[in-house]
Amino acid sequence: KETIYLSKILASIIAMFTSMVVVFISLFIACYSKVLFDYIANSLTHISGIYNISIFGLILTFVLVITVELLTLLVSGITGLLFGHKKNNNKMLLSVLFGFITYACAQLAVLGSVYLVGLTNDGIMQIFKTNQILNVNVLKELLYMIIVIYIVIIVVINIINIFIFKKGVDVE
């Protein structure tokens, strides 16, 4: 049973990454112009200078944040499918509902984790107290922390999903 679940999650992850690449290439083809390309290059150079990080590091960090966010959405949807298909009636509606609830709980866990860290870190707590722009080091710390939090959430949700799948549920 665990192998079936892992094959489904792997196929979903591959489809997600393929979709991300196709969207990026499509946007590049549709919107490419020398002016836009120069604008993006100048913006990346400027932002990487402000954050004291290489352009590659900047792009990698943001791609990682987006990827773990989308993976959280993916595993939340799978959780919704598993819980929804355990019921006899309204499987699709319940799958969407449980998926949304799982995703909302994951986002609340991220927010709660950031708040808990903010209790000991005044820089991060500024997110909750003011609308001022964050210090560069605080923002970098926050991005790295969020990546770790999302990875923990993804692992926990997958452990729950494997447990539910092993108990028996027909998702075909």
Where in this protein do the model-derived segments appear?
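Helix-loop-helix units of permease transmembrane domains in multi-pass membrane transporters
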Residues: 1-13
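Short, membrane-exposed interhelical loops at transmembrane-helix boundaries
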Residues: 45-51, 120-142
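Secretory targeting signals
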Residues: 10-81
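Juxtamembrane non-transmembrane "cap" segments at the membrane-aqueous interface
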Residues: 32-42, 106-128
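Junction motif at the cytosolic side of a transmembrane helix
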Residues: 80-92, 152-172
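Hydrophobic alpha-helical transmembrane segments of multi-pass membrane proteins
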Residues: 63-71, 100, 148-152
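Central hydrophobic cores of alpha-helical transmembrane segments
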Residues: 92-105
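Membrane-embedded or membrane-proximal helical elements that form or frame transporter/channel pores
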Residues: 56-60, 132-149
